[in-house]
A protein has these predicted regions:
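Beta/coil-rich, acidic/histidine-enriched accessory regions frequently appended to metallopeptidases
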Residues: 30-31, 36, 210, 274, ...
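Residue-level recognition of tetratricopeptide repeat
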Residues: 36, 70, 104, 143, ...
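Canonical positions in the second alpha-helix
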Residues: 53-54, 87-88, 122, 162-163, ...
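Juxtacatalytic substrate-recognition/specificity segment
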Residues: 83-84, 229, 236, 263, ...
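Structural marker of alpha-solenoid helical repeat scaffolds
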Residues: 57, 91, 125-129, 165-166, ...
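Structural signature of tandem alpha-helical TPR/SEL1-like repeats
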Residues: 42-46, 75-84, 111-118, 148-159, ...
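Helix-start (N-cap) detector for alpha-helical repeat units in TPR-like alpha-solenoids
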Residues: 28, 62-63, 96-97, 130-131, ...
C-alpha cells in the first residue's frame, strides 16, 4: 500500500472510529487530542514525542504530522521542520491542516516561493464540506485560502461560519473567526467569538489571549493574586505560550517598560532561540534607546533564517512609530512594504503613520491601497470614509500653521483657532530655540468619533481632547463638549508637544513632554493647566509620589492626573531654578540619544535632584491651605456633625469638608449671609482654592442672593483666574450688568469663548466692545462669527457689518447689505445704504 493511499484509508477510518466509539472518546481523549493538549499547555517535548511516535496506521496520522511540524517551528527547530516537509513531498498538500503548517514552516525558514507553491497546490483541492467531524479541516482550508489572499468574506461565508454552525462545539472555528476579526481591526466582533470559544473550552490560553488582544478587561470576579487580565490567564495555562509572551513584551515596550519587555522577549528566546519577532522586538527597543550596535546585532539575528522576512522591519517600524519616532518607523515600514508590497497590514500601518506624521498624500495612498486589497479591514474603511469627508473641509494657513475644520466650525471660530495656533507655535518655538522645518497641521474634528478614527483608526478614546504626533495635532471640536473643557488651553498644550518633540527629535519621554506642556499652559494663564489640590497636597507631603525616573508609569494607571501635575512641577522646577537655557540644553541632549536622567543631571548641576525637587514640591504643597484640615470626616465625626452642623463647624472651623457641607445646606435654605460669612473665612485660609467643590462659585451664589453684584462679579473673576474651565462662571459674567470698560467686557467674552465658541452673547459682547474701542478688525471678526451662528436678527447684523466695511472694503460691504435685504426686503436703512454703492459690474 502506498503512503498516500494509506493516508486516505486512515482518514476514512478516523471518521468511522469517531462514529463507533464516540462514548469511549468522552471517557478518554484520543491520542491526537492528548498531544494537542500537551502543546496548549506548553509541554512541547511531550507534544513532539507523541507526534513523532505516530505511524501511518494511526487514524489521525496527517494531524500528527501537522502537529509535529508546528511543534518544531514553535521551538525553533526550523531546519528539522523543513526536512520533515521535504520528506512529505507533494503529499504535504493533500490535507489542509498539514498543508497549512507545512507552508508556515517553509515561510518561517525563508522558503517563501516554495511555501507559496505548496499553498497554491493545496487550495486547488475541493474544500472539505463543513461537518462536525471535519471542522478542523474546513477551518484549515479557509486559513489556507486567506494565506493565498482569497477574499476574506468568501472564506468567512463559505467555510468558517458554516464550520461553526456544523460543529458548534468545535474549537477551531471560534478561534479562526476571532483571529480574522482581529486582523480586520474589529475587536468587538473578535471578542464575541473568543468569548463563545472560552465558554466551550474554559481556561484555553488561545481564547484568553484573544480576549486580551480584543481589549477586554478581566471581570473583577475572575481576578486573584497574580491574575489581573486575560493575558495573565493565558500565561497561567501555558507559561511558554509564545504568542502571549510576544504580546506581553510588545505591550510593555509600548509603556516604555523596556527592561521588563526585554526579560519577556528573552523568555521567548528560551523557547525558540531564533524567533525573528522576539529579535525584532529587541532590535526596536535598542533603536528607541539609540543603541545602534545592539540594534544591528539583533536585526541580524532576526534575519538569520530569512533575510527578506517582512515581519522584521514591520515590527521594528511599528514599535518605533508607537514611540513617536515616526521618521525612523516609516523608514522600516517602507522596507517592509518593499519586501511584501501587497500586504494590507503593512500598507495600513505605513499609511496610518504617514498620516500621523503629516505625510498626507503618501499616507492616504497607502491606506487606500490597504482598503482596496482588504475591504473588510474596519480601521482602513473608517479612515477612507473619513478622508472623503475631510476633502470638503476648508484649510486656512498662517505663519507655518495649517488649520483644517468643518465648514460650520471654521465659519464660527476658525479665525480665532488659527490665530491662537500660530501664536502658540511662534511663542513656543522662540522660547525653546527651534525652527520647525515643516508646517504644523491642526485638525479640529466636529465629532468625537471622527477624531478617534483620525487619531487611532478606530472609535473610542473618549477621554482624549487632543493628541499631538509632532507635525500633526488632532482635536475634538468643542461643539460636542460645550462648557466641559477649555479648547484653547488644549490647543496650546498640544502645540507645546509639537515643539518639544521636534527639539528632542522625538526622543523626549512622555512625562517630560506632558510636564512641559502643562507648565506652558500655566505660563499663559494661571487658570489653564493644573494646580495644587488637597489630594495632590497629601500625596506630596506623605511621600506617595513616584521618583522622577518612574514618572512615565503614572500615565498608565489611576494616577494619571497626579502624573500630569507632578511632571509639570518638575518642568517648572528646572526652569525656575536653572533657567530656560538648562531646559533647552536638556532637550538638545535628548535629541542626540542621551538618556533623560543623564541629560537632566548634566544641566541642573545638583547633587541630589530628587531630594531638591521634593523640597520644592513640598514647599508648594505646604503653602496650599496650611491652616485648613483637608481630611474627610470619619464616620463618628459625621454622626456628630449631623446632630448640629452649625455647632460642629463652629467648634471645628478648619475642617474644609464639614464647612462646605454646611455651606451647601445653607445655600439650599437660601441663608445667604450665613453662607457668605463661612465662605469668606474658608477663602481667606486658601485664596487660590482649586477644589472641585469650590467656595468661589458658592460665594458668587450667596452674593447674588444678597443683591451684591460687585461681590458676585469679584467671586466669579477670581474663580476663573484659578480655573478657566468653569463655563457657568463665564456665562454668568456675561449676564451681569453694571459699569464696565470695553476691555473688561471683551475679556468676559473671550473667557466664555474658551469653553464655548458657539455662544452668541459672547460675540455680541465682543462686537460691541470692539466697536466702542474703535477696533474695526475685531468688530468684523465678532460680527462674522455671530452671523455664522445664524442668529434671529441676522438682517440687522448684516447691515451693521456692511456699514462697518463700506469705506474700507466696499465689495464685501455691498454683499452684506444685499444679505440684509434678503432677510428683510423692506429694511429701509439697508435700502438707503445700498443706494450709496455704485452699480455692480455686469457678469462676464
Amino acid at each position: 500500500m502506498t503512503w498516500e493511499r494509506g493516508f486516505q484509508r486512515c482518514w476514512r477510518v478516523a471518521i468511522a472510529m469517531a462514529a463507533l466509539h464516540g462514548s469511549a472518546s468522552a471517557q478518554e481523549p484520543a491520542p491526537i487530542d492528548a498531544a494537542r493538549s500537551a502543546f496548549l499547555k506548553g509541554d512541547y517535548a511531550a507534544s513532539l514525542a507523541a507526534a513523532q511516535k505516530a505511524t501511518p496506521d494511526d487514524e489521525d496520522f496527517p494531524e500528527f504530522i501537522a502537529l509535529e511540524i508546528r511543534t518544531l517551528v514553535e521551538t525553533g527547530k526550523y531546519q528539522e521542520a523543513v526536512e520533515r516537509v521535504g520528506e512529505l513531498g507533494r503529499r504535504a498538500a493533500f490535507y489542509p491542516e498539514l498543508a497549512l503548517e507545512a507552508g508556515r514552516a517553509l515561510r518561517a525558514a525563508g522558503h517563501r516561493d516554495v511555501a507559496s507553491d505548496l499553498i497554491e497546490r493545496a487550495v486547488r483541492f475541493e474544500a472539505p464540506r463543513p461537518a462536525k467531524d471535519k471542522s478542523r479541516a474546513t477551518v484549515a482550508f479557509g486559513e489556507l485560502l486567506l494565506e493565498h489572499r482569497v477574499d476574506a468574506k468568501v472564506v468567512l461565508d463559505r467555510l468558517l461560519e458554516p464550520a461553526k454552525k456544523a460543529d458548534p462545539e468545535g474549537r477551531a472555528p471560534y478561534l479562526a473567526l476571532g483571529k480574522l476579526a482581529l486582523a480586520n481591526h474589529d475587536r468587538q466582533l473578535a471578542a464575541e467569538y473568543f468569548r463563545e470559544g472560552l465558554k466551550r473550552f474554559p481556561g484555553d490560553p488561545d481564547f484568553n489571549l484573544g480576549l486580551e488582544q480584543s481589549g477586554l478587561d478581566l471581570p473583577a470576579a475572575n481576578r486573584e493574586p497574580g491574575i489581573a487580565s486575560y493575558l495573565d490567564l493565558a500565561l497561567k495555562a501555558n507559561p511558554k505560550h509564545t504568542a502571549a509572551l510576544l504580546f506581553k513584551a510588545t505591550e510593555l515596550t509600548g509603556r516604555k517598560a523596556f527592561k521588563e519587555a526585554k526579560d519577556v522577549f528573552e523568555q521567548v528566546l528560551a523557547i525558540n532561540p531564533d524567533h525573528p519577532e522576539a529579535w525584532a522586538g529587541l532590535a526596536a527597543i535598542a533603536l528607541v534607546q539609540d543603541d545602534e550596535k545592539e540594534a544591528t546585532a539583533a536585526i541580524a539575528r532576526a534575519k538569520k533564517l530569512h533575510e527578506d522576512n517582512p515581519r522584521v522591519p514591520e515590527i521594528i517600524g511599528t514599535t518605533l512609530a508607537g514611540q513617536y519616532r515616526f521618521a525612523e518607523g516609516i523608514k522600516y515600514l517602507e522596507e517592509a512594504r518593499q519586501l511584501d508590497p501587497l500586504s494590507p497590514p503593512i500598507l495600513f500601518e505605513l499609511g496610518s503613520n504617514q498620516l500621523r506624521f503629516g505625510q498626507l498624500d503618501h499616507g492616504w495612498e497607502n491606506v487606500a491601497l490597504a482598503h482596496e486589497l482588504d475591504p473588510y479591514n474596519v480601521a482602513a474603511f473608517n479612515l477612507i470614509t473619513l478622508r472623503d469627508k475631510l476633502r470638503d473641509y476648508p484649510v486656512r494657513e498662517k505663519d507655518g500653521v495649517r488649520l483644517r475644520m468643518s465648514p460650520e466650525d471654521m465659519a464660527v471660530f476658525g479665525g480665532r483657532a488659527l490665530e491662537l495656533a500660530a501664536r502658540a507655535k511662534t511663542t513656543l518655538a522662540d522660547k525653546y530655540g527651534i525652527r520647525l522645518s515643516v508646517p504644523v497641521m491642526v485638525e479640529i474634528l466636529p465629532k468625537q468619533e471622527d477624531f478617534a478614527i483620525r487619531t487611532f483608526g478606530l472609535p473610542g478614546g473618549e477621554s482624549f481632547l487632543g493628541v499631538c504626533f509632532g507635525p500633526l495635532i488632532t482635536m475634538t471640536s468643542p461643539r460636542g463638549r460645550l462648557g466641559r473643557s477649555n479648547w484653547e488651553a488644549v490647543l496650546w498644550h498640544e502645540m507645546a508637544h509639537t515643539i518639544t518633540l521636534d527639539a528632542s527629535r522625538h526622543r523626549i519621554p512622555r512625562w517630560l513632554s506632558e510636564g512641559i506642556s502643562v507648565f506652558e499652559e500655566r505660563e499663559v494663564h494661571a487658570g489653564w493647566g493644573q494646580g495644587m489640590t488637597s489630594e495632590f497636597r497629601k500625596r506630596f507631603l506623605d511621600g506617595e509620589v513616584p521618583p522622577i525616573s518612574r514618572l512615565d508609569e503614572s500615565f498608565a494607571g489611576e494616577d494619571i492626573m497626579l502624573g500630569y501635575y507632578h511632571s509639570s512641577l518638575v518642568a517648572e522646577y528646572i526652569v525656575r531654578t536653572f533657567g530656560m537655557e538648562a531646559m533647552r540644553a536638556i532637550l538638545a541632549d535628548l535629541s542626540t540619544g542621551k538618556p533623560v536622567d543623564e541629560a537632566i543631571a548634566k544641566h541642573t548641576k545638583t547633587a541630589n535632584l530628587e531630594k531638591d525637587f521634593l523640597e520644592y514640591a513640598k514647599k508648594i504643597a505646604n503653602s496650599y491651605g496650611p491652616d485648613l484640615d483637608w481630611t474627610p470626616l470619619e464616620d463618628e465625626e459625621y454622626v456628630a456633625y449631623r446632630e448640629d452642623p452649625a455647632k460642629w463647624v463652629a467648634a471645628n472651623p478648619k475642617r474644609y469638608a464639614a464647612t462646605m457641607m454646611l455651606v451647601s445646606a445653607l445655600t439650599e435654605e437660601r441663608k445667604w449671609q450665613d453662607s457668605k460669612d463661612l465662605l469668606e473665612k474658608i477663602i481667606a485660609a486658601e485664596p487660590n482654592n482649586r477644589e472641585s467643590f469650590n467656595p468661589y462659585m458658592s460665594l458668587a451664589l450667596a452674593c447674588r442672593g444678597l443683591g451684591d453684584e460687585a461681590g458676585e462679579r469679584a467671586a466669579l473673576l477670581k474663580l476663573l483666574s484659578i480655573d478657566s474651565n468653569v463655563s457657568d462662571a463665564a456665562a454668568r459674567l456675561l449676564e451681569l450688568g453694571g459699569t464696565m470698560s470695553a476691555a473688561e467686557r471683551a475679556a468676559h467674552g473671550d473667557q466664555m469663548l474658551q469653553t464655548n465658541p458657539f455662544q452668541e452673547k459672547a460675540y455680541r459682547t465682543l462686537a460691541a466692545a470692539a466697536k466702542e474701542s474703535g477696533d474695526p478688525r475685531r468688530t468684523r471678526e465678532a460680527l462674522e462669527s455671530l452671523l455664522a451662528l445664524e442668529p434671529r436678527d441676522a438682517g440687522r447684523l448684516h447691515y451693521e457689518l456692511a456699514t462697518l466695511l463700506r469705506k474700507s472694503d466696499p465689495v464685501p460691504a455691498r454683499r452684506q447689505v444685499l444679505q440684509a435685504l434678503e432677510e428683510n426686503p423692506r429694511f429701509q436703512a439697508a435700502l438707503e445704504l445700498l443706494s450709496t454703492f455704485p452699480p455692480a459690474p455686469p457678469n462676464k
